[in-house]
């Protein structure tokens, strides 16, 4: 039997200056729809991001946040940048990161990141099972 699993898909842009990240964030926040923000972030990532993920629109992939499987007590890092992954996991846990909203800039050893959760699957944030895709 398959158990409950909470996963998010994350995209990001990383730049070397906080001021640039703030300008990019302002540009993203001008877009009214979450779907439009995702598309804009993908274009901006391809043009400005320092991360190799820019070739795929800043896609960092899926991160599993929770499971009702008692055998899973800890999660191995999914991202190469463990520092960034910790920020993402904490932001989702604290409800400061939400699907479709731009989060950041967040500074790591790689630079300044803007983070966007583009999809959420199996959210435990409500009573209903969600598989929302933007």
Residue ranges and their predicted role:
Residues 13:
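Glycine-rich loop/hinge motif
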Residues 1-9:
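Acidic/polar surface patches and capping/hinge elements
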Residues 16-133:
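Peptidyl-prolyl cis-trans isomerase
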């Amino acid at each position: 039997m398959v158990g409950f699993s909470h996963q998010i898909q994350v995209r990001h842009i990383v730049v070397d200056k906080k001021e640039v990240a703030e300008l990019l964030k302002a540009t993203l926040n001008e877009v009214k729809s979450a779907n439009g923000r995702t598309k804009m972030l993908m274009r901006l990532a391809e043009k400005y991001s320092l991360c190799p993920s820019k070739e795929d629109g800043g896609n960092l992939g899926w991160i599993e946040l929770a499971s009702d499987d008692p055998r899973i007590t800890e999660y191995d890092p999914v991202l190469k940048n463990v520092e960034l992954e910790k920020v993402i996991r904490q932001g989702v846990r604290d409800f400061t990161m939400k699907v479709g909203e731009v989060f950041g800039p967040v500074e790591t050893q790689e630079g300044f990141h803007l983070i966007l959760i583009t999809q959420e699957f199996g959210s435990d944030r409500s009573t209903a099972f969600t598989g929302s895709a933007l």
